[in-house]
Structures are given as structure tokens and as C-alpha cells.
Amino acid sequence: MGVTILQPYPVENKSGAQTIEFLVKRVLALGAVQVGHFLVDCETYTSIPQIGATKTVHILHNSEQPASVFSILDTGTKQIPLVTDGLFDLLMTRISPVYTSKKQTKIESKGPRFEFGDFLIKLGSVTMSQNFKGVLVEVEYRPCLVASSCWELMREFLQGFLGSNVSNTIPAYFAQRININTNHTKANDVYQPIDTINQYLEHFTNYRKQTTPVVAPRV
């Protein structure tokens, strides 16, 4: 895998399905070829008050890594990532007396998947409890493993079919420092699958907070 950038796309005077259809036409016009579909989902569990300070565990799955389960423990002061196999899902059901699932906040992004040269493009319709929340575009540049080395190329590519919605500056996620005592940021670090998961969690959290009604996708 390479470096992945996530970009929300505004739904203006269109349904979710119309927005996806519009973007599909743009992507196909580039010469991209559809290669199946994708799915990224997230379910959140919260610890019961009786065991002390509240902790949250986010469980995510990505169809690009079907054998892996990604979990992120949020202690309130820091986030601890963990990558395991599918048995972790079973473990979460076994500890349900301690961690309870917020079923109403289960969220996912799914849609068509395209290949265009060295780029992988995914057009995601984001839904939470079957309610449409927005459109999230994922672009991966597969030959590169360090975001700072290919951001300008990815920015130009993203702006080519998403327009001015794409900022000229690299997403804030990549500006995070790896070590508090250095200026080494995630943009200069080797990209890992957990970085894609962290970006999805960041956007999913924003969508969960969203209260403005969004036009539902047409079937």
C-alpha cells in the first residue's frame, strides 16, 4: 500500500446518490476503471463507570485488509492503536459487561472503488444507523510511502476532480508530531495501514457530531 488522503466532499443541492454519481462520472472521465467496491466501518464501545475513568474503544474494519481488526483505545489523554485478527471482534462480545457498544453511532463509508494508474480512488457514502451523513473520498498513491514526498502530486490529482474543496496544505493529521521533542511529523514518517484507520476515525467523529440535516441518498 501507499499514502492515503481522505477528503470530505460537500453535498450541495443533491442527494448522496446524485453526488456519488457526479463524482463517478468525473473519475471515469479521467480514464479510471472501476474495480469492485469497498467498506470501512466503525463501532464504538464505552467502559462502564464502575471500573473508574471512562475509556472508549473504537473498532474499525477496512475491506482492503479483510483479515485485520483495527482498534483504538481512547483514554481521554491519549490514543493507543492495536492491530489484531478477526478474533478480536469475538473478544469484544465476551467483555460486553465491561464495555458496551453504542449501536446508534455505528458508522460506515462504502461505495465504488477505482484504479487509475498508480492511484486508487474510493468514493464513499457515509451513513450512521442508516442515516446519510456525507461523502468521503479516499485517494491512495501506491508507489509512495512518505506523505511529504508525494503530497504535492496528490494535491494536484485531488484538485483535478474535486476542485477547490481540496486545500493547498497537507491535512492536519499529517502535521502531528511523532515525538514531542522533535519536529518529525507523520508527514515525514513511513505510512502504515493504521494511518488510514486514524484518518477515518477522525472524519467519522466529525460526522457523528454533525447535527445539520443532510439530504438522504436515493436508492
Curated annotation (Swiss-Prot):
It comes from Aedes aegypti (Yellowfever mosquito). It comes from the Eukaryota. This is Mediator of RNA polymerase II transcription subunit 20. Keywords: Activator, Nucleus, Transcription, Transcription regulation. PANTHER family: MEDIATOR OF RNA POLYMERASE II TRANSCRIPTION SUBUNIT 20, UBIQUITIN SPECIFIC PROTEASE HOMOLOG 49. GO terms for cellular component: mediator complex. Signal peptide: none annotated. Component of the Mediator complex. It holds the Pfam family Med20. GO terms for molecular function: transcription coactivator activity. The gene is MED20. Belongs to the Mediator complex subunit 20 family. Coiled coil: none annotated. It is found in: Nucleus.
